[in-house]
């Protein structure tokens, strides 16, 4: 959330941010409400001052025996009290409206962020891991076909049980997912992260605190009730990312200067309704309704957030470096940055099994596995997370940052395609072998049920 003072003093910067991020918000109404609210607060102060003066004279007038003047003062005091009540009621209504309207304003991008309208104008900063990439089969089988051939991914049964956009990982596929999660957690523990295992349901108030609500209500899974129905602060939703509960751990709290920086990591399943709206990405596990992820959340002093941002990026990249997966780093332009971010980098892993329009020149496609974001004080204001620089100083809002460390299904896609062998097996990355009881190769398993038989082998 932007502060009232910032919006009041820098309306053109806010207007530029609305244009840069393509956000539709009524800034003129916000400024109008803020001005009227301040006028009413000033009028309220005047009325309280006048009423106190009048009230203080009532006793003196009665003591002096001037009953008519005393009665007139009493009536004047009551009139001032009534007017003050009306002014305060109107001011309260305006303040509530102003708070709602401020939630519709996005974070102002950093001045050095690339300016652009869409992902086409994101800036590739560098590539890693391509100089010594492994030899691939002449024709790489896409993960969704290979996963079914090896019987480690089951899309049909996932859809049968839960609907489209859900899947089963099985056998070595399930072990590989578990291995990835444990490997990622170990990597980030080495980087100084403390583990948090968060609750899966989160309140609407928590979703507002991190900026998912009110803008992205339609993408969330509501626990009871329709998404388009009104909701209260306490209504529960399935978490779309562990960023929500971990950031809101400290909502409405004041941390001490000695506490900072706080670095938490959290594994969780994540739930999003948006899957299935992106063409060819609906095949396989690139874009699904439920997926596993390790999230990194940082709470820092304002003066440290720029440096910590680059440190967080390196910490997320470490996972891909140790898996020996080629990837690239993009800096997001203003139009593709997101509602809450001041600055954002994406890490995209190379998956060679499916060619994409505008994809890498060597074929295949890029898959986003992490977004590393600096929110500055935007989330901290929404969730009212503060810190006290010194014990006797005023508290101020800290800065929050987060990044995925990283999304599991898309890394699984990259492994199945990049570590694929000519014989249709998959080599287990060396870094994951200790997490799979030393297994070095995924060869698949025997399929179960009549559906695994050819038509000629089935009984009538």
Curated annotation (Swiss-Prot):
Q: Where is this region: Disordered?
A: 50-71, 109-129
Q: Which UniProt keywords apply?
A: Aminoacyl-tRNA synthetase, ATP-binding, Cytoplasm, Ligase, Nucleotide-binding, Protein biosynthesis
Q: Extract the PROSITE patterns matched here.
A: AA_TRNA_LIGASE_II
Residue ranges with Basic and acidic residues bias? 50-65
Its EC number is 6.1.1.11
GO-annotated cellular components: cytoplasm
- What is any one GO biological process for this UniProt entry? selenocysteine biosynthetic process
Q: Which reaction does it catalyse?
A: tRNA(Ser) + L-serine + ATP = L-seryl-tRNA(Ser) + AMP + diphosphate + H(+); tRNA(Sec) + L-serine + ATP = L-seryl-tRNA(Sec) + AMP + diphosphate + H(+)
Q: Which InterPro entries match?
A: aa-tRNA-synt_IIb (IPR002314), aa-tRNA-synth_II (IPR006195), aa-tRNA-synth_II/BPL/LPL (IPR045864), Ser-tRNA-ligase_type_1 (IPR002317), Ser-tRNA-synth_1_N (IPR015866), SerRS_1_N_sf (IPR042103), SerRS_core (IPR033729), tRNA-bd_arm (IPR010978)
* Localization: Cytoplasm
Q: What is its main location?
A: cytoplasm
- Protein residues bound to ATP: 272-274, 288, 368-371
Query: Which ranges does the record mark as transmembrane?
Result: none
The Acidic residues compositionally biased stretches are 109-121
Quaternary structure, per UniProt, is: Homodimer. The tRNA molecule binds across the dimer.
HAMAP family this protein is in?
Ser_tRNA_synth_type1 (MF_00176)
Function field = Catalyzes the attachment of serine to tRNA(Ser). Is also able to aminoacylate tRNA(Sec) with serine, to form the misacylated tRNA L-seryl-tRNA(Sec), which will be further converted into selenocysteinyl-tRNA(Sec).
Q: What is known of its domains?
A: Consists of two distinct domains, a catalytic core and a N-terminal extension that is involved in tRNA binding.
Entries under PANTHER family matching the protein: SERINE--TRNA LIGASE (PTHR43697:SF1), SERYL-TRNA SYNTHETASE (PTHR43697)
What's the name of the protein? Answer: Serine--tRNA ligase
State the gene name recorded for this protein.
serS
